[in-house]
A protein has these predicted regions:
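Short, surface-exposed connector motifs at secondary-structure boundaries
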Residues: 61-68, 89-91, 136-139
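Conserved catalytic network of the ASCE P-loop NTPase/AAA+ motor domain
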Residues: 8-10, 60-63, 86, 112-117, ...
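Conserved SF2 helicase motif VI
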Residues: 148-155
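A short beta-strand element within the Helicase C-terminal
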Residues: 123, 131-146
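Conserved helicase ATPase core of P-loop NTP-dependent helicases/translocases
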Residues: 69, 79-80, 89-130, 152
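Short, basic/glycine-rich phosphate-binding loops at helix/coil junctions
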Residues: 12-40, 84-89
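Conserved interdomain hinge at the start of the Helicase C-terminal
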Residues: 29-73, 79-84
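Post-DEXD/H (motif II) to motif III coupling segment of the RecA-like Helicase ATP-binding lobe
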Residues: 1-17
Length: 155
């Protein structure tokens, strides 16, 4: 079943909200698109204005009773978000590639133990959260970096 058919079958509505920003890469595009894409990632990770705006939106979502997943591709970005969001959100759970089986199990248990009425946010890399991760409470997705192919979003 393709992503559109799956979305149509779900008992909830999908809404995409685009947040225009003032971000400007400020550099010329080179001939190696992969290198340029990685450079763009780093510029976005380092953009404090952009990151602050994302964190404000996440905190607002949690206060509105949402259970968001913040998705990035950079561990450094996860660390930055964790540092800011931990001051405002009671439960910040970070999931990233390279976590051992024991650590993954510990984080899964921690997630399961968070009461529904308590605010929480999951920060994760796409590589970790891809196939096989399921959390029925997730209802909001923040894509903090551009994606380079459609399959990333479909998952």
């Amino acid at each position: 079943m393709d992503a559109k058919a799956q979305a149509a079958a779900r008992p909830f509505e999908h809404t995409v909200i685009v947040r225009p920003t003032t971000f400007q890469a400020g550099c010329a595009i080179g001939t190696d698109k992969w290198v340029e894409f990685q450079s763009l990632y780093q510029l976005l990770v380092d953009d404090e204005t952009q990151n602050r705006a994302i964190c404000e939106e996440v905190v607002r979502a949690v206060r509105d009773g949402r259970s968001p997943l913040i998705l990035t591709e950079r561990n450094e970005h996860l660390d930055r978000f964790e540092g800011v969001l931990s001051a405002s959100v009671p439960h910040v759970v970070v999931l990233r590639g390279g976590m051992g089986k024991k650590q993954r199990r510990t984080e899964a248990e921690r997630l399961a133990a968070i009461p529904r009425e308590e605010g929480r946010v999951i920060l994760a890399t796409g590589k970790y959260i891809g196939e096989g991760f399921d959390d029925p409470r997730l209802d909001t997705l923040f894509l903090t970096l551009p994606v380079s192919w459609r399959g990333t979003i479909a998952q």
